[in-house]
Amino acid sequence: MRIDIITIFPDYFGPVGPSGRVGASGPLGVSLIGKAGARGDIDFRVHDLRSWAADVHHTVDDTPFGGGPGMVMKADVWGDALDAVLADASAGTARLVVPAPSGTPFTQELAAGYARETHLVFACGRYEGIDSRVAADAQTRMTVDEVSIGDYVLAGGEAAVSVIVEAVCRLLPGVLGNEQSNRDDSFGGTGGAMSGLLEGPVYTRPRTWRERTVPDVLLSGNHRVIARWQRDEALRRTAVNRPDLIRRLAAAPDGLDKRDRQVLADAGFPVDTENMAH
């Protein structure tokens, strides 16, 4: 996969070398994703938006038409940047992702969809955002997504891009040491035992720590019983923290079996009524 990131703060993603290649530090150069980049499995390229600003001050923003506070990032600068980044890309293969509080919520399902792409381009906005004509123009050449990572506002798109890139790249083949890890993720929709649920509690050695012991069931060696316990715990946690996910499962064919519904009812979250108890 090729990932291009356009930003006015390229150093946010680590030291940038020739052709926008990222060095072995920063969020793109560390951990398993950094190793995937070093192997060439992921081609990261980071570009300084100011490189396409024509004036001596490398201006990338201007006052908004219609008035109002703040500044808006200029269409001409962004247009030239996207033209240059896409110049050596195969026609129709790139997908543009623009983080924005007003965008579509970013989900695990969307991350899985992005992981099937061959080329992602991220546009890191700042100030009041990017002139809306940039996305409209880009849509004539590629799919364009405005994506929100949550109901809050950041100073710029760089942090959001880091979140999205990590969520996507860990789903690529060979990035994680154990591919099974993806199947039982929170929000996993790949048919694992935790599909549609938040992941439950996890434990490791020592068995006893500060007088707190690991649940005996996890030491039993009975994988069927362990799997059931893990699902029960996931159901309880999801009901408390994300009841909307339980409602979604309850409405889906085969989303919850009889045991699931009993576990939830015992925990005070009956799902056979329109509104669950809390």
Which ranges hold each PLM region?
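SAM-dependent methyltransferases
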Residues: M1, G196-L197, V202-H278
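N-terminal nucleotide/polyanion-binding subdomain common to many enzyme families
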Residues: M1-V85, R224-R247
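Hydrophobic/aromatic beta-strand patches that form the interior of the parallel beta-sheet core
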Residues: D4-I6, R45-H47, V97, L120-F122, ...
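Short His-Asn-centered micro-motif
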Residues: F9, P99-P101, A123-G125, G150, ...
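Intrinsically disordered, low-complexity terminal tails and inter-domain linkers enriched
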Residues: V16-S25, S90-A91, T273-A277
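S-adenosyl-L-methionine/SAH cofactor-binding core of RNA-modifying enzymes
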Residues: M73-D131, P173
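Structured adenosyl-cofactor binding patch, chiefly the S-adenosyl-L-methionine
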Residues: I130, V134-G189
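A cross-family acyltransferase "interaction/gating" segment
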Residues: G177-T208
